[in-house]
């Protein structure tokens, strides 16, 4: 089989490495891929949002199956386009990807179908939003309606911060059209949990839960990032909570999308907050999370391609999906200065003996060498029997990788470890 994978991050590298375990897979193309992915797939310089280019390439290269993982091409209708060419895909169509593409849509969906989430108001005028903030409870959360590279959510600790966020998003157009409307919502507290799931629009199979670390610096300080590391499973996510989420959140979401004529197939990501009043949805993503994928897929015992195809063809209920009972930890190594300004072009040295555990993101190939080209450069994952061992092993591997201006958090998994050892 010839497989096409759209995207260029560590998440795509994790997907590609897992797909390679299937003997039917003869060739994997990554569009555009990156310098590190080039060791595991043929990278083709067609951007993830160049839907015409992707379709043209797929048509001319006998692609048997396509995996579309980034949010932008999904929201732009990449899957619809490839399906029209007769190419089966993993990922939702455009009318279902809106669950991530529009915060206003997803909040209204939850309200309409009684899915637990934070209280909220929607505004399409800055004046109205600013007036509302004069008396709104603080802290509060401001969300741009559309996609904003994961940067469109601002937690405002003061009224002034909240108003500043509204002005930046709606008047200064910090995120362009994505900020034409905003959601202002209640600030929830409690442990956060990421749950990725496979779904064919009828059956939902949750993957192993994980805990992301969004802030750039230790002790959850610094700016928000795309994610600086993850551990799986998440110790706060007990069987009792998982059962409750299936009944109150996961299945109701799939059923709500069906009722709206927007059947969702692919990977649906649930960002959850475990509040005193039970689990609530903070966000939906219409695809694998990054770096959650880098801990969840290494724990998947079943064949990934088989499970993906089951979501496409509606046979997930008959397809066994098994996960290891081990623990995984991923530490993200970034360029100093991320997520603001950082230098690029530094050579990356990864010892051969740990290469299988490394998922490359912001790196390019230059004169036969791998060099830094992005903020989050790579993630290194360890799978061990216990969480403590997985964390220690991931850091041991990270210390063996070298590039100029590298930095990473030193407390990935510390909170999870404390929770595990409290039990």
Located regions from the model:
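Peripheral (often C-terminal) accessory segments that flank ATP-dependent C-N-forming ligase machineries
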Residues: 310-423
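Active-site nucleotide/adenylate-binding loops and adjacent lid/helix of ATP-dependent enzymes
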Residues: 4-5, 100-181, 235, 239-251
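ATP-binding N-terminal substructure of ATP-dependent carboxylate-amine bond-forming enzymes
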Residues: 1-94
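Internal nucleotide-binding/catalytic subdomain
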Residues: 152, 156-293
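Active-site "cap" helix and flanking loop/linker of ATP-utilizing ligase/carboxylase catalytic domains
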Residues: 246-268, 285-353
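Solvent-exposed alpha-helices and their adjacent loops that cap or buttress functional pockets
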Residues: 21, 36-38, 90, 112-114, ...
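Glycine/small-residue-rich loop that forms an oxyanion/phosphate-binding "nest" at active or ligand-binding sites
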Residues: 67, 78-93, 98-117, 121
